[in-house]
């Protein structure tokens, strides 16, 4: 169903092709069709969620498959990160899930502070961040662990490497794969050393 009006969100689909669209997956055209054209027949499904604001501009809200199940609730990481990033002391954040005996998964936040946040008491900041999340999304989305970091592992195009953060949150430091292509490979060791 196509969503009309403004102030709405949903899955981002594209109706018409454009010059740079991928035409196939080498050697597996059927997989290409199943991945991008079966969820919404006749439309290209990007895999992203989007928000159309009050004036009709679109904003990508994150991957729709980037969902963590906590106590039976499906929680998208993008809305939680957006809530955290509203805090005046926060510059950027990334959320991952890690196994929890009771909830199935728990939420682990990696948070980069702005300059004014660096001098604040970190325990109070953790409480304030969780209060903001609880207020905007609900108590179920509160983070179990919040680690303050100086940076996040990113590719040269700026994509956060969540698989690395997930392994750190799980306490699995055995194999991160090739991290030499990261924009800032040294940050991985720093985050490992500060793990909660």
Model feature map: region roles:
Residues 13, 72, 150:
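Small/polar loops that bind or transfer phosphate-bearing groups
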Residues 32, 46, 155-157:
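Ser/Thr-centric signal marking residues that sit
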Residues 1, 48, 149-155:
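Active-site and channel-lining beta-strand-loop segments
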Residues 18, 23-27, 34, 42, ...:
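AMP-binding/adenylate-forming catalytic core of the ANL superfamily
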Residues 151-176:
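A contiguous, mid-protein "functional segment" used to position or interact
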Residues 1-37, 75-77, 173:
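Conserved ATP/PPi-binding loop(s) of AMP-dependent carboxylate-activating enzymes
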């Amino acid at each position: 169903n196509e969503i009309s009006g403004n102030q709405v969100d949903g899955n981002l689909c594209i109706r018409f092709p454009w010059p740079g669209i991928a035409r196939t997956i080498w050697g597996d055209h059927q997989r290409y069709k199943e991945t991008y054209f079966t969820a919404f027949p006749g439309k290209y499904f990007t895999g992203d969620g989007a928000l159309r604001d009050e004036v009709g501009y679109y904003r990508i809200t994150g991957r729709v498959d980037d969902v963590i199940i906590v106590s039976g609730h499906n929680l998208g990481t993008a809305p939680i990160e957006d809530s955290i990033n509203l805090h005046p002391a926060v510059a950027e954040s990334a959320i991952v899930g890690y196994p929890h005996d009771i909830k199935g998964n728990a939420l682990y936040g990696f948070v980069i502070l702005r300059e004014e946040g660096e001098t604040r008491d970190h325990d109070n900041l953790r409480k304030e961040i969780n209060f903001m999340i609880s207020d905007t999304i609900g108590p179920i989305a509160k983070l179990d662990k919040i680690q303050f970091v100086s940076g996040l592992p990113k590719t040269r195009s700026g994509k956060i490497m969540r698989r690395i953060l997930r392994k750190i949150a799980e306490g699995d430091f055995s194999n991160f794969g090739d991290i030499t292509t990261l924009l800032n490979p040294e940050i991985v060791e720093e985050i490992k050393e500060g793990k909660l």
